[in-house]
């Protein structure tokens, strides 16, 4: 860990750290290393799941993000879901979890339903974004959307995650009617209004 942290610290940039914008809590330590650089350094390391879990437990932004690339997605299962969920404190770490790690898990569907039914908004966000980029999206995931929006009526991350999932679902002919039904069922709220506005230009009115 010390060697990896040393590589990160060489790329420290206070201006970048000060300019960062994300939803949620701040990290304990933030060296301001850009995401592309964090990814590049992490990918140069050999995959080691136990080491990744150790990195993830540290209160350092760059180590938490690097853990997503050093961990082995095939070992990300329901039993470990709570461990990873606890570290999802903001939109940045949730997005990295979704794109680099969770979407490749063999148990994505099980983790998706576990996280969207939980109380961590950023875990729900990660689940939505990961499922949107997966090959296992079905009507059962689409059918969770109304409950998610009702649970988070004023959340921009959730709204963005829902749009990503519904947009992905609409690319499948067999799911288009399900997407339309969900959109028609949404009650007025900041989250729902954002979703409806974004989806309005993604779904042609003539269809």
Language model features by range: what are they?
Residues 1-207:
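Alpha-helical scaffold domains
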